[in-house]
Amino acid sequence: MQPQGIGRNMIENKAQLLADLAYIGSKVQAKTNVYLFSGAAFQWHGLKDITKDIDICCSYEEADRIVSMLRMFGKMESVTGINDIHFLRIFLKSFTLQIFIKEVWMGDEYQLLEAAHCDSLTFGGITFLIPDIKTLLMIKDRQIQALYNEWKKLKGETCT
């Protein structure tokens, strides 16, 4: 649930996405590399018109640098998602940033990010690495499989 009065709820186009990435980068001056994935990355590649938030993945140290600079500009919460994946969510003035930490997030997906050909955008101290479409689809496929397995567990069925 989004705090009242914070956020516009959706990132409606690539220009808005770039402005939001620039905002994050303007607050973090220390050299930091993060992977942009999920909806925002699909939007970057022109495969999605609107996305609800910006998802990034990085090391614990890089997440700490980002959180220490952004927490004063918005409300932060810790979230437990599908398969007990923990991540941080920061509600900023006009958008929501979700941070998945390499050491907490599932390693296979992070290895896919590390092996991917990536576009890169640098704003302030942050370089946003945007994986190729094939890698994004492979990660999305794994997320769908995890959702399916969770559904099967809820129904009491065996996962394969």
In which residue ranges do the predicted regions lie?
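Short secondary-structure boundary/capping segments
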Residues: 26, 46-48, 89, 113, ...
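Short amphipathic alpha-helices in soluble, non-transmembrane regions
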Residues: 66-73
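Catalytic cores of NTP-dependent nucleotidyl/adenyl transfer enzymes across multiple folds
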Residues: 107-160
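Helical scaffold of the NTase/Pol beta-like nucleotidyltransferase catalytic core
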Residues: 1-36, 62, 154-159
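Conserved catalytic core of two-metal-ion nucleotidyltransferases
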Residues: 74-108
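Active-site nucleotide-donor binding segment shared across nucleotidyl transfer reactions
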Residues: 23-54, 58-60, 65
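A general structural motif
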Residues: 31-32, 94, 118, 125
